[in-house]
C-alpha cells in the first residue's frame, strides 16, 4: 500500500517568469551534440564513429569502456561533423549536422499485449542497444544503472517541485499508453515495487491510471518532488542495497522504443525566467 507523506521542512521560492500553458514549435537546430559529461558515472567513453559518418537516430556514437554494452546514441539523423576532444584526448562531445529527415534505426516493435511475454534479457538488450538504458539511474551515487545489478525497487517522481518547474500534466499529455508500456518493461528488472510518486494536493490525469505500480503521495514545499527525498520517506536504501530511479520522460521513451520501435528524442521543455520575454513551452529534441 502506498504512503502519504507531508513534508514540513523546505521552501518554495516564488520566482518571476513562469511559463504560460502554450506549446510553440521551433525549427530543428542544425547541429546537435552529445556530451559524455551529461551522463554521471560514465567511466571512460570509447568513440564508435568517425567524422564524415552518416548516422540515424539510435546509431551508437560512443560506449562506456567499463560496461561495453551501455552505448550512447545519436538523437537525430545526419552526419558526424566533429569529434571534439580536450586535454589528454578526453572526449568532450560528438557533433552531428542534422539532415532534418528524422530517420531512425529500426528496433523490434511490440504490441501492448505482447510486452508481458518479453523476458528481462530481451528487454535489456533492446534498452542497451538503443541508448535508452542511460535513463536508468542507480542509487546510491546517482550513476547510470549497472546492467548486472537488480534493484530492490524503482522510483519515478511524477512531479517537479523546483522553482519554475514545468507542468507535467501539460508536457506529458497524451503519453499515457507509452508511460504504461514503459512501466510494463521496468517491472521486468525488479522483484520489488515500481513506485510512482504524485503530488498529494492535485489529481494527476496522466499518471494516476497506471497499472502495476504503487502510488505514493507527497505534499509540502520543495524538495518534495525530488526523488532522493521520496526514497528516504518510502523505502530508504540500506547498506548493500541499490535502487533505480527514472523520470517520466525516460519511462515514456522506453514505451515508445517498444511500441514504435524507435529511439524518440523529441520532448517538450519550458523556457522560463524573469529575463525571458515570452516564457512558454517549446517542442524540441535532446542534444
Regions found by a protein language model. Give the residues of each.
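Buried, small/hydrophobic-residue-enriched core segments of structured protein domains
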Residues: 70, 84-286
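Short histidine-centered loop motifs in beta-beta connectors
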Residues: 45-54, 58
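N-terminal, Lys/Arg-enriched amphipathic/low-complexity engagement segments
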Residues: 1-48, 215-218
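Short, charged beta-turn/beta-strand-edge "cap" motif at the junction between a beta-strand
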Residues: 60-69, 87
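Short, solvent-exposed loop/turn positions at domain surfaces
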Residues: 43, 49, 66-69, 278
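Short coil-to-beta-strand transition motifs
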Residues: 69-77
Amino acid at each position: 500500500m502506498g504512503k502519504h507523506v507531508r513534508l514540513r521542512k523546505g521552501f518554495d521560492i516564488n520566482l518571476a517568469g513562469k511559463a504560460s500553458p502554450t506549446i510553440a514549435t521551433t525549427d530543428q537546430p542544425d547541429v546537435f551534440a552529445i556530451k559524455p559529461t551529461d551522463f554521471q558515472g560514465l567511466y571512460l567513453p570509447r568513440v564508435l564513429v568517425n567524422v564524415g559518418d552518416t548516422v540515424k537516430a539510435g546509431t551508437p556514437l560512443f560506449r562506456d569502456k567499463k560496461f561495453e554494452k551501455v552505448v550512447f546514441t545519436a538523437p537525430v539523423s545526419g552526419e558526424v561533423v566533429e569529434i571534439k576532444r580536450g586535454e589528454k584526448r578526453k572526449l568532450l562531445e560528438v557533433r552531428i549536422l542534422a539532415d532534418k529527415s528524422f530517420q531512425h534505426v529500426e528496433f523490434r516493435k511490440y504490441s501492448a499485449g505482447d510486452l508481458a511475454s518479453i523476458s528481462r534479457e530481451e528487454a535489456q538488450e533492446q534498452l542497451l542497444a538503443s541508448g535508452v538504458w542511460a535513463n536508468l539511474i542507480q542509487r546510491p551515487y546517482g550513476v547510470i544503472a549497472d546492467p548486472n545489478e537488480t534493484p530492490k525497487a524503482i522510483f519515478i517522481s511524477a512531479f517537479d517541485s523546483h522553482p519554475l518547474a514545468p507542468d507535467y500534466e501539460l508536457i506529458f499529455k497524451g503519453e499515457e499508453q507509452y508511460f504504461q508500456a514503459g512501466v510494463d518493461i521496468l517491472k521486468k528488472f525488479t522483484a520489488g515495487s515500481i513506485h510512482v510518486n504524485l503530488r498529494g494536493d492535485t489529481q494527476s490525469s496522466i499518471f494516476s491510471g497506471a497499472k502495476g505500480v504503487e502510488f505514493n503521495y507527497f505534499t509540502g514545499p520543495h524538495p518534495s518532488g525530488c526523488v532522493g527525498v521520496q526514497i528516504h520517506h518510502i523505502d530508504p536504501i540500506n547498506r548493500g542495497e541499490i535502487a533505480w530511479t527514472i523520470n517520466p520522460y525516460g519511462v515514456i521513451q522506453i514505451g515508445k522504443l517498444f511500441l514504435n520501435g524507435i529511439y524518440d528524442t523529441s520532448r517538450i521543455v519550458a523556457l522560463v525566467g524573469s529575463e525571458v520575454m515570452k516564457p512558454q513551452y517549446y517542442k524540441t529534441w535532446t542534444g
